[in-house]
Amino acid sequence: MEEPGMPHESAEDLFHFNVGGWHFSVPRSKLAQFPDSLLWKEASALTSSENQRLFIDRDGSTFRHVHYYLYTSKLSFSSCAELNLLYEQALGLQLMPLLQTLDNLKEGKHHLRVRPADIPVAERASLNYWRTWKCISKPSEFPIKSPAFTGLHDKAPLGLMDTPLLDTEEEVHYCFLPLDLVAKHPSLVTEDNLLWLAETMALIECECSEFRFIVNFLRSQKILLPDNFSNIDVLEAEVEILEIPELSEAVRLYRMNMGGCSRTSCPPPSPGKGGRSAGLESVKPLYMMALGLLVKYPDSALGQLRIESTLDGSRLYITGNGVLFQHVKNWLGTCRLPLTETVSEVYELCAFLDKRDITYEPMKVALKTHLEPRTLAPMDVLNEEWTAEITVYSSQQIIKVYVGSHWYATTLQTLLKYPELLSNPQRVYWITYGQTLLIYGDGQMFRHILNFLRLGKLFLPTEFKEWPLLCQEVEEYHIPSLSEALVQCEAYKSWIQEKESENEEAFPIRRLHVVTEGPGSLVEFSRDTKETMACVPMEFQDCNDRTMWNKAKGTLARSSQIEEAEQYSQTIQMSLCRGAKRAGNPSTYSHCPGLCANPRHWGGHPESPPKKKCTTVNLTQKPETKDPPVTPMQKLISLVREWDMVNCKQWEFQSLPAPRNSSLEEATLQHSSGSEAVSQPSTSASWKGHSTASEKDPGPQAGAGAGTKDKGPEPNFNPYFPMKRAVALKDWGKQRSKERENPAFELTLPEASEGDNTGVILKVTHPPVVGSDGSCMFFEDSIIYTTHMDHLRRTPPPASPQPREVTFLSFSLSWEEMFYAQKCHCFLTDIILDSIRQNDPKAITAKVVSLVNQLWTLHISPKQFVVDLLAITGFKDDRHTQERLYSWVELTLPFARKYGRCVDLLIQRGLSKSVSYSVLSKYLQDG
């Protein structure tokens, strides 16, 4: 009930703040008492139509004390443990009265208000929250009934409170586990404790908060407990249930060293007692865990189920449109549950469902629907069913970070300050790229590490007792600055001296091994957390000089809203809730090593799109040796596996700088050197004989380096700069202020008569582009064939500069669709460029250009295109090649057309860094 004397505040009178994942609401009347604070300045600047929650990238637990002070103008008793961190927040928020109160407290002029219910109230509020607001995507609007209310932090982050998984009034302990760990220790996951499953992790319910020490041991093989740990009995009971021998032995030895029992009196580890691992010698298949999870929910929560798959059909996923899936997607960015990893498991899944009862009927129907034969939709109707969309992400992208039994919210900019964190494949997994991050570590310790990432300084509670565990965590993150900060920490030095003076063998001193250097490459990432009430990030500058936050207000960038969302409305710097990505290899896709995809899924499956690693921005990559294709899709890929290499190896674009006050020179394609060409077989080698103009060459097939002395004219690519250049991802942290000016030059695109409707090949460099499915790979260059130049030519340059912190983009295509779209574009442009390079007669080149044009404009079918193409002199024409090539073109052409529209939109929107074009008609002219 509402406490007497507390004025009721309507929703319109409340300001909402998301502080590091904790949600707070403050009445306007209370906040107005601090007119000089940044909280008031930022919140009061919002218009009534802006139903937004301001995001502050700071520690939410500490902000509870700020929140309490805003209500009462007093400090709570529990704040005394973290006065340094509280002072930092007050300084950054410019809460001068709170700073004065803290100074008075230091001088003994202020006494803390005893408030026993401080933290318990917060926990009760959050429990009530996730029972009341279960399975909805809207952020909570918890009514403020008492000044004791200290913010909402969802103790069970998924809020899966529907019967029967979490049908309890008690606090629910949870833990995020990497699937690799589950594979090693299957007893960790059971039908009763599994809450959710994704490609990289499993979320389980725990019996107690001490479960985190078990997970820490399984990672480090060390029992690291707080000083004077008193809950060893609870921990031991949980260990007994798991029946992991090495864990049981480690806990037994720890108890002996504590003095709880001697070697003679301490009982040996008992054999199996029918615990979780009984009968579980290996991990269950994913489909058994996923379907076993879903059958516990009512059909009303699941909605309409459907099965999705990769294009080769090897990996299946199940999802639905019910409130359960909507809620999970709001938290994790994805709601697909993985079912299979290989083609053979698809058959096992069918056999498994055949033996299930009526409770599995919705899953059976979904699988049957998925396996029904389907015909490809006509290409000319794709326009009505699909719309090209681009989502823009900035460095202020809000990322939810799940660590063990805790979760946090921060910005991509914070995670980028120390790139060693995200380049650590042993600790970091993306659940949804750039939106939700899984870190394999201790959740409580990560709070201190995250505060270091934010502030550049280590803030620890006064009575900190987990030094051995903190040392272990700091070592494993491989962040030199963090290691140095701990070494310089006075409290850490005191603890070391204390343990050395005690000289106790029972407590081996856990000294810190300082990391002197981290991984050499900077890897970056991706995408944004989407709330129905958009979070507008508020960025602290330097806390020591009390400068204001900066801000750019806007809605989430999608479809028609994107134009408004990208505009800067004020000089206060505060950018969109969007994120970042990393550089890669032109004309191919890039992959951030270790942290992007689940290694269980991408590493060893030939049916998956191959993965290429990037350690530097412009790394030249060699083709990978692949296993023989095992699926029909891979058989198609094998036919054209090297066709894309012409544009990224044999034909390399010159860089296209845009210096001011200098003329733009025509950029030409350069043929690779002989030694490099040998390693890249000509794309014509697999499907084309020697060129007509090169018949004097002895070999029946022209290699990549063959015919160079008779090589025809090199295609010219003219630079075209339709916009001010976007800041590259690798540069935004170094030169934010440097690139405010510097507009790039523009060149008009060719007139229609010059293009003569034969088409144009575009090379577009742009910020990293990811798929809409949250995959962790991306493109930075796109080479496309297009005939739609009129709308690009009519597009005026942007009237105002684009956001300086556009770090990556997302197309309305999945990663796999973009992958095959690029392959198709490279194939179409390659057969044209190859004909020019081989100095074919102009009649043959004109025929090739005409066929590509007719295929692209849908004047001929893919089958007719293949028949006519292979009938050209010099091409291999046999039935087997014809059928395979026809199937491949039919599959990939729709993706290529969609991708081309997205690139067109990217250019129109001024999001490209540079555009080069080559008009094909001039190579068909006589003389």
Curated annotation (Swiss-Prot):
Gene3D superfamilies: Potassium Channel Kv1.1, Chain A. Residues 662-692 have a biased composition (Polar residues). Residues 603-631, 662-718 are annotated as: Disordered. It is found in: Nucleus. InterPro entries: SKP1/BTB/POZ_sf (IPR011333), T1-type_BTB (IPR003131). One of its GO terms (biological process) is cell differentiation. The modification Phosphoserine is found at residue 270. It holds the Pfam family BTB_2. Residues 18-72, 399-486 form the BTB domain. Keywords: Activator, Differentiation, Meiosis, Nucleus, Phosphoprotein, Repeat, Spermatogenesis, Transcription, Transcription regulation. One of its GO terms (cellular component) is nucleus. Its main location: nucleus. Transcription regulator which is essential for male fertility and for the completion of meiotic prophase in spermatocytes. Regulates progression of the pachytene stage of meiotic prophase and promotes the transcriptional activation activity ZNF541. Required for the organization of chromosomes during metaphase I. Identified in a complex with ZNF541, HDAC1 and HSPA2. Identified in a complex with ZNF541 and HDAC1. Identified in a complex with HDAC1, HDAC2, DNTTIP1 and ZNF541. This is BTB/POZ domain-containing protein KCTD19.
